Amino acid sequence: LEVFTDIDIPKEYFEDILKRQAVVNAGVTFTFRNEEDGKFTKTDYCYPNGILDYVNEIAGEQTLTMPQFWQAERKGRDREDKPEYKVRISAALCFSNRVSRLEYYHNSSWLEHGGAPEKAVKNAFVYAIDAYCKQAGKYTKGESKLTFQDVADCLVLVTNCFSTQTSYENQTKKAITNKFVQDAMTEFFRDRLHVYFIENKQEADRIADQVLVNKRSRESAEKARLNIKKKLTGSLDIANRVQKFVDCRTKDVSKREIYIVEGDSALGSVKLSRDAEFQGIMPVRGKILNCLKADY
């Protein structure tokens, strides 16, 4: 207590830890008892089907595809001089246009920063969905390849892996770096997605269509952002002046004048008769509203 003077840990921290442990340890009940104002409250966390129940909870009922549960075991090594070990891979996933979530667990620990499983998922999902879009003719002519962000925006995925050898990125243990785990998971997801798309063509079409909607909306938003940024930060020149505005030559603001005229026809007449040294002109569209006949 002399060193750690603040021991008031919020209950939400314990609730989050216990819930995550219940997710990755199917059928095991974790109980949280908390005393407040002399009274105990009790909360149980249990997912009989583990990560599959968790994905159902996150995605809800309105999903693009039915939740899937895939699992496999692989055996290999990270390098030739390293010992061989086993890895058990489990994954639950579905696609949704309402919610997205990606969570990776290894040996019952939440990998907040992902590492090898995250890299495997990115590689496999982009490869499989891009291949399906090309095969099904989903891309327009000359369209760029989709990115993982386009996939992630409609993907609910939870992976839960166990291995007898684990290499963590650092002491925080929030990411793993096992090359074999990454390669095994990449192959696992590529194969499962390939088979899934063949056996479930309607769902594959819905997935591809939603991913392409995400991609095209992202590209449109990025294009609009860059155009606005260019207009706001670019220097004033002939290319980005206000349309139809006729400027004057002097930079002395005390002498500059602006004439607002009605329509392009008036613009032509005033432009011929003005003093271009200090008089600018801005035409506006005329007769937009007849105020005498307006109903307000």
Write out the residue ranges for each language-model feature.
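GHKL-family ATPase ATP-binding module
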Residues: 1-296
